Swiss-Prot record:
Family per similarity comment: Belongs to the IspD/TarI cytidylyltransferase family. IspD subfamily.
Native source organism of the sequence: Prochlorococcus marinus (strain AS9601)
Site (Positions MEP for the nucleophilic attack): R150, K206
Keywords assigned: Isoprene biosynthesis, Nucleotidyltransferase, Transferase
Top-tier EC class: transferase
Highest rank taxon of the organism: Bacteria
Residues annotated as site: Transition state stabilizer: R13, K20
NCBIfam families linked: ispD
Pathway the protein acts in: Isoprenoid biosynthesis; isopentenyl diphosphate biosynthesis via DXP pathway; isopentenyl diphosphate from 1-deoxy-D-xylulose 5-phosphate: step 2/6
Encoding gene per record: ispD
Protein name: 2-C-methyl-D-erythritol 4-phosphate cytidylyltransferase
Protein EC: 2.7.7.60
PROSITE patterns referenced in this protein's UniProt entry, alphabetically: ISPD (PS01295)
Catalytic activity: 2-C-methyl-D-erythritol 4-phosphate + CTP + H(+) = 4-CDP-2-C-methyl-D-erythritol + diphosphate
Pfam families per record: IspD
Length: 223
């Protein structure tokens, strides 16, 4: 399985002053923990890190021995552009790809393998968890408009997996039509292409704030 890891997070909400994947988690960087999980999956055989050139040496150095097992890909101005760059950099024989947020450093390798396996039967899959909170849709003034049935609500995670040719086609259409999305599954939604949900775990958090880092430390100490 070919694997792409967008790794250009600025860390502004973390107030880190650097790429957030360089932040320390129990003695190792976030990118180290992410690569440890990804490379532990039985299905992983090729990994590309997509980041900004200025961060290349810092990220690869902090990845330690794992750096020798990955390929560096220069990212774009947005996550969407970076993923497209990653797709263009895949080996020509790549048929399937998993895309995973670099800041989700606690992904279970078994879930990676499950996503890879599900791509044998589906053209697109994503990890997600059932929403447990009541969600409100509000208007521009901040007043509640409606409350959707949470039985149909899932919180999207990564990895998200796709057939390479299909995802490339979706990204090229997005460029032509100037679509802006925050994850790759959204492109499939716009095109009315099916995406299969695979239930993930609540421990697969994305490190975006200081409280997330505190939670991640608890999971690392108590796996």
């Amino acid at each position: 399985m070919h694997f792409l890891i967008p790794a250009a997070g600025s860390g502004s909400r973390m107030k880190a002053g650097k790429n957030k994947l360089l932040i320390d988690l129990e003695g190792e960087s976030l990118i180290y923990w992410t690569l440890k999980s990804v490379l532990s999956a039985n299905s992983t055989n090729w990994v590309g890190i997509i980041g900004q050139p200025k961060d290349k040496n810092l990220l690869l150095n902090s990845a330690k021995d794992f750096a020798q097992k990955v390929h560096w890909i220069n990212g774009g101005d947005t996550r969407q552009q970076s993923v497209f760059n990653g797709l263009e950099a895949l080996p020509k024989d790549a048929k399937k790809v998993l895309i995973h947020d670099g800041a989700r450093c606690l992904i279970n390798p078994e879930l990676i393998d499950l996503c890879a396996k599900q791509l044998d039967e589906n053209e697109a899959v994503i990890l997600a968890t059932k929403v447990t909170d009541t969600i409100k849709i509000v208007d521009k003034e901040g007043f509640i408009k409606e409350t959707p049935d949470r039985n149909y609500l899932w919180a999207a995670q990564t990895p998200q997996g796709f057939l390479v040719d299909r995802l490339k086609k979706a990204h090229k259409m997005a460029i032509d039509k100037k679509w802006k999305v925050t994850d790759d599954a959204s492109l499939f939604e716009i095109l009315n292409w099916k995406v299969k949900i695979i239930e993930g775990t609540y421990s697969n958090i994305k490190i975006t704030s200081p409280i997330d880092l505190k939670i991640a430390k608890l999971f690392v100490k108590n796996p």
